[in-house]
Amino acid sequence: VEMTVDEVTDWLQQHGITNLEAAYGCSLGGACLTHFLALGKIPVKCAVIDAGITPYQMPLILRRLACLRDFWGFSLITKSRKILEAAYPPERWTLPGCDPVKEYDALAAYLKTYSKHTIRNIFWSANNYALPPEPAETGCRMIYWYGEEEKKARRSNIRFIKRYFPQMRIRGIPKMDHAELVMMYPQEFCRYMKEFLNLEE
């Protein structure tokens, strides 16, 4: 997370970009946006953190055990097509007009490219990235989205983000699971974004 944010910040600054009108990040991308906003090196006018992952607030040994749990869970999905389809049913997670068999063939092949080291790094960084004690004051208008079907899983993230960013608004998206809105319903996603950004049709 920290490395990605540093690289993005450097790139923006090298290209003369000193502020952003809007920013969006989902899941791990939401973790990156949380870190980006906290540092405040490049002010953002409006930000949407969609089911963003926040740092664990527990002892190191428990964080290591949680990382091990996530690692093995993800590893099972990468090794078993049946587990992949049970966790993410093709009838729900295939875009209209796409062949679910071809889509999941490609997804399964892609997941196998992840090394054990990469998987561990992803989960450790997503849940243990550093934040300053208090975020930079930039006047950003921000909102945290989550799918209502993942509300229990996001509970600790919501609790943390509300405490860390007091101005953060929270919005549950009906009938949606993790990252489902942006991945499966682009028109609805645009509608929600326009509503937040106060853009007219």
Segments predicted by a language model, with ranges:
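Active-site loop/oxyanion-hole signature of alpha/beta-hydrolase fold enzymes
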Residues: 1-24, 187
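Structural beta-sheet core signal
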Residues: 23, 49, 144-146
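Gly/Ala-rich beta-loop-alpha elbow adjacent to hydrolase catalytic centers
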Residues: 24-33
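Flexible "cap/lid" loop of the alpha/beta hydrolase fold
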Residues: 38, 44-75
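Conserved alpha/beta-hydrolase catalytic His-Asp/Glu region
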Residues: 58-59, 79-136
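Conserved serine/cysteine hydrolase catalytic core
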Residues: 117-163
